[in-house]
Amino acid sequence: MEIDELTALGGLLHDIGKPVQRAGLYSGDHSTQGARFLRDLAENTGRAEYELLSLFSEFHHKGHMKNDELMIRRIKELSPERFGLTMEDVLNALWIVYEADNLASGEREEGQPQASRPLYSVFNPGKAYPWAELDFEKELPVPGDVFSIRSQDYRELVKRLWEELSKAKLRSDRLLPVLEKYLTFVSSVTSEGNIISLYDHMRMTSAIALAMLRAGCTAEDVRSGRCRKEKRFLLIEGDFSGIQDFIYRVSGKGTLKYLRARSAYLELIGWDVVLEILSRLGLTRANVVFNAGGHFMIIAQNTPDAVKELEEIRAKAVEWLYREFESDLYLAIEWEPVSGREFGREGGKNLFAEARKRLKHKLTVRKLKRFGEIKGLFEHGHTERLAECPVCGRELPEGKLEPSASDPETKVCPTCNRLVSLGGNLPKLLGFGRTAKNDAGVLVEGPFSGFVPYLQGGRPVGEQILVKNTLNPGEIPESAQFVPYFVADYFKKDPKGGVATFEELSMASTGTRRLGVMKGDVDRLGEFFSSMDSPSKLATASRFMDYFFKGYIGAIIEGKFGYIIGDVPSLRDWPEEPDIVVVYAGGDDFFIVGAWDQIFELAFRVRRAFNAYTGGKLTLSVGLGYFDERTPIYRMADVVSERLDTAKDEGRNRVFVVGRSRPLDGKHKLSYEWNHYEELWRTYAPRIYAGNGRLKGKLESKKGLLWKLLEIRELYVRDPNDVRWAYLTAYLLGRHGLSDLFPELVGIDTKAVERKEPQPVYWVDGVLKIVLMAVRR
């Protein structure tokens, strides 16, 4: 066993005693019980390494570290030489993990610890979770009034953990998913209101410990405080820009497959860069604080060699991106030296947030110098005749275009051709093998590696195997690194099992034949993340956020969690196989297409689920659009992006439901606050809409009346001070004997006038237009 492996694994397992103690399996504090658990595991499995790792549980608190004689005696008893280690190696590793434990969360048992206390929500610390395995196929983890976790729940947890640790290969890449599965909903400490998942604390301890080791820290450095005071660490951040242009600026046949392929390809490019950084700097996946939405952060060592490697990685990645996509897609990579103390708070200051703020400034400056890493960027590069790729619009030498894999009569660029194949394979993929670019079977390439599809029934190849939507390594070779990655990949199947087309989705609509498009993201997320005051808190928050969109969106689309979501605005019974395709969902945003009426309803389903998931503390804004299926996707993306921006600008926590007009002064809002729209729907829809594309009662033969109401609303929009609209509404409804349908629209709402708010007639179009689309024949 190498010293770096010992340190990384020691960090991962140092707090294993916490669930063991709460299960009441042994006696003593959690350090003692964790050590006994690992020693028993070693004896039961015959893996002596677990006995060596038990030292990291036994010696990771200040009181234990003072007893040098005991520590040295315990190390000698285990004969570190048989593991290829020296006494000094193990002693240094123990002190490093001890310090990393302190730095990872700044957490210690404060107040009155209580073993049964649950993990509180990072979004709403007033609510907590029951213990459960992390399983996206089961329940949506909703925080609530949970006051304790039963010891029998912990016993069941420890039993399952024992079983999997007994079988898992003793390597960071294999232990991380086991710990994530069972310790995500376990509190790292049992003091009141703790929001840090034990899994995230343990992996951040491992990350910081390995970075300390790589930075040359020793036991003496820890004792003297040098590793805490000196800038021995790097916070590395990468952020893609131009994502929307990269994904949506495509056209031609099979556009939806292209979109999904480009979204998946972007994910692979990001992983290629992240894994290259980890490989060259000698780190593990635990060092990745987050990697979501084209944005990643890594904790590393601050050494000249590490900085040199990062400079080379950045230059090569940016040059490759420019060569492949010209200026469409850019990756800014920066790093900030930090000391150990800057992983937390000090004197009331959030030093961790301040360090991240400095890093963010560096990233902003680098984005302003976009592609400045490339020498000779503006030198004339082509003398040959140029031709345009009909899919992505890039210009490149005519001779480099090649017959499309899906339509040999059309010539496309090599990248789009590979993405045609990727799009066709995505429904069958279990993941990808990361390997050398010139290896057989490479389908797409990143800046540093090639990716070979891992198909059902096939054998994965590559040094690292990225496996989709599972924490189980399955059949991948033991020699390969296991990289679980999660992706929201729900799609409506066409008759051949592939991805449905825009035409097929729009044809499944109720009423008018339209394609619905939804774009949304989380409000004020930057403010939320800026409050995080430790790597472990940031890791917990970003992981929980990312998993809502990558892990649970698919289940929401499938109609699950109805008991949480409740009744939402709906035009038809929710289908068993919704006519919806997720183009992208992850990080804090999503872009989804489908039958327009299902997309309309899905927006409210997602919002309700997200509200429950975050304990009611965070909000979403969404822009909706309904288009002819022949509309270019980039135009659809532009429209819903503008509508999302409008919802944000008008106060956030809002939905732009449908295109609307407003008075020229621009003071009236175009979007709706979610609760307001749901209230309007509950008020008006049951009076006029029978469901599944039919109007109610006598309105079935008087559809024109609803159109007339929309015309009257336009009178109000032209001049809100002119009251003719009120008289015309009263006359119209009275003439048809329907005044009881819209009593709110008859007359002038004086309270709205006093509050300087629009009259009810201004808001009614958001319901009427949707209903009229649903009943159109």
Curated annotation (Swiss-Prot):
Residues 513-660 form the GGDEF domain. Its cofactor is a divalent metal cation. Gene3D superfamilies: 3.30.70.270. InterPro entries: Cas10-Cmr2_palm2, Cas10/Csm1, Cas10/Csm1_subtype-III-A, Csm1_B, GGDEF_dom, HD_domain, Rev_trsase/Diguanyl_cyclase. Its EC number is 3.1.-.-, 2.7.7.-. CDD domains: Cas10_III. ssDNase activity is inhibited by EDTA. The keyword Nucleotide-binding applies. The keyword DNA-binding does not apply. Keywords: Antiviral defense, ATP-binding, Endonuclease, Exonuclease, Hydrolase, Nuclease, Nucleotide-binding, Transferase. It comes from the Archaea. Residues 1-106 form the HD domain. One of its GO terms (molecular function) is exonuclease activity. Disulfide bonds: none annotated. Ni(2+) and Mn(2+), but not Mg(2+), Ca(2+), Zn(2+), Co(2+), or Cu(2+), is required for ssDNase activity. Coiled coil: none annotated. SUPFAM superfamilies: HD-domain/PDEase-like. One of its GO terms (biological process) is defense response to virus. Probably part of the Csm effector complex, that includes Cas10, Csm2, Csm3, Csm4, Csm5 and mature crRNA. Will form a homodimer in solution, interacts with Csm4, which is a tighter, better association than the homodimeric Cas10 and uses the same interface for interaction. Belongs to the CRISPR-associated Cas10/Csm1 family. Encoded in a type III-A CRISPR locus. The N-terminal HD domain has ssDNase activity. The C-terminal GGDEF domain has the cOA synthesis activity. CRISPR (clustered regularly interspaced short palindromic repeat) is an adaptive immune system that provides protection against mobile genetic elements (viruses, transposable elements and conjugative plasmids). CRISPR clusters contain spacers, sequences complementary to antecedent mobile elements, and target invading nucleic acids. CRISPR clusters are transcribed and processed into CRISPR RNA (crRNA). This is CRISPR system single-strand-specific deoxyribonuclease Cas10/Csm1 (subtype III-A).
